[in-house]
From Swiss-Prot:
One of its GO terms (biological process) is protein modification process. Its EC number is 2.1.1.77. This is Protein-L-isoaspartate O-methyltransferase. InterPro entries: PCMT, SAM-dependent_MTases_sf. The gene is pcm. Disulfide bonds: none annotated. One of its GO terms (cellular component) is cytoplasm. Belongs to the methyltransferase superfamily. L-isoaspartyl/D-aspartyl protein methyltransferase family. SUPFAM superfamilies: S-adenosyl-L-methionine-dependent methyltransferases (SSF53335). It is found in: Cytoplasm. It catalyses: [protein]-L-isoaspartate + S-adenosyl-L-methionine = [protein]-L-isoaspartate alpha-methyl ester + S-adenosyl-L-homocysteine. The keyword Methyltransferase applies. Transmembrane segments: none annotated.
């Protein structure tokens, strides 16, 4: 999977490629869809959510430029697969999930497979996780109508935020935001994507958005 679906499509960061090769995606989906785990596409999980396609996980990780010293905030734990990838790249990953059922299952999987530098909690991801801020990296695996102000505030100086944003679920752009100093941010459009909605106080108000 790594060579054909990820490296061949432009992912060059050796640490990202190594992490993708180490994490068994089939362990993060239901048994009945495990045979599809290494296809490069999203797969359905509980609560109407999805596990992102491997290539998109790799793109977001590479664009975040994660170092071994970085503290990472992930918004949208989902199955725990992306958190497992990020845990191979960072010092610690704090992952916020809206759905308690998904959070508990992800926490169980991550602990079972030895990803001990991941902390999972339940809450409104659009508000971030202020307790452990600032973060060198914030990665958001759900798309909102705007970049949540709370996430910008919790980004460290020189930090990187990777987030899908758009006026509807059918029209999203993957954005990279770099915090240059206390008051200035630099924005870069990385291209079109499609993610589940970021629901919360600073995101969409419902799971269906038009």
């Amino acid at each position: 999977m790594v060579e054909k679906q990820i490296a061949a499509r432009g992912i060059q960061d050796p640490r990202v490629l190594e992490a993708m090769g180490k994490v068994p995606r089939e362990r993060f989906v239901s048994e009945h869809i495990a045979p599809l785990a290494y296809e490069d596409r999203p797969l359905s999980i509980d609560e109407g959510q999805t596990i992102s396609q491997p290539f998109i996980v790799a793109v977001m990780a590479q664009q975040a430029q994660i170092t071994p010293q970085d503290k990472v905030l992930e918004i949208g734990t989902g199955s725990g697969y992306s958190a497992a990838i990020l845990s191979q790249l960072a010092s610690h990953v704090y992952s916020m999930e809206r759905y308690p059922k998904l959070a508990e299952l992800a926490k169980k999987r991550l602990q079972e497979f030895g990803y001990n530098n991941v902390t999972v909690s339940v809450g409104d991801g659009s508000l971030g996780w202020e307790e452990f801020a600032p973060y060198e990296v914030i990665i958001v695996t759900a798309g909102g109508p705007q970049i949540p102000p709370s996430l910008l505030k919790q980004l460290a100086i020189s930090g990187r935020l990777v987030i899908p944003v758009g006026p509807s679920l059918e029209s999203q752009q993957l954005m990279r935001v770099m915090r240059e100093d206390a008051d200035h941010y630099r924005y870069e459009n990385l291209g079109s994507v499609q993610f589940v909605p970021l629901v919360g106080k600073e995101g969409w108000q419902t799971t269906s958005s038009s």
